[in-house]
Amino acid sequence: IMEIKAGNKINQQSNGDYVGIDEANSNIEALNGYIHTLKNILVYDDAVMRNDVLHKRIRFDAMSLPPQLTNNNIRWHNVDISDANGYTVTPDYCGEYFTFNDACSCLMWGSQGWAAFQGDEINMKDNYDFTLRLLPVPPGNWEFRIGYNAEGWRGMGQIYFDGVITGTPVDLKIGDVQGDARTGWVADESTADDGVENDKMMRNLGYMKAPESCWYAHDNIPLRDWYKALRYIVNQYSFQDYGAHKLRMRSVDFAGREFSIDYFEFIPVDMIRDEDRLY
């Protein structure tokens, strides 16, 4: 795994160093393509990658996990589909990256006016039992979160992380009503410190506001300012080996309820105290 930022900045370190394109010596036409010169040698330094480049919050969209959804033009092509309500796939369509039981209905959809990270989400309906293969992260102590949009038609699901049951079932209806004391959400503008203490209170309840860098086009506000846009703190884990992890969710509610998955976050535990809220 490597990190690529806007402007072709590869593996940028905290001191600002990165490997990039030497624009003055690039776009050189060759027989079968073009040559682009790098400013430095691209070397994988385990210490630098583990302790600097990859030692940061990692946020990723649920639909970005199975490569089949991007390679087959499902992702990015499911927004506001005319005369349709999204896409569905068979339980084995995505191989090991995303599987679910036959009793489940899977809906993949998106909308330019929906309060979702990157505009889309996966909704698992009926008696679902599904598993997602998450991104690999380096060894260390990490906190894992689920980003979602609270709605009255959501349901409850039991979470399993790497095969181990995690706490009590999470109810995605919680937060559907503004002022729900179970999440503790209070608008930043209604506080004396722009929401700083409210962020701490929400964390104590197991929740966080959505990132401020994401935009809610329907109301033309940052996603952080929408009370239904929440992050649920699943747990903190100590990973001994570098590798991918499995997230399983199983329905414990009425068949008509759904579990919505929008995006996920991993963050090193030692960064939580000083975590920025913008990005």
Where are these regions (language model features)?
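Extended non-catalytic domains of envelope/secretory-pathway proteins
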Residues: 1-3, 7-11, 25-26, 36
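FKBP-type peptidyl-prolyl cis-trans isomerase
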Residues: 27-44, 259
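Well-ordered beta-strand scaffold positions
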Residues: 17-19, 34, 164
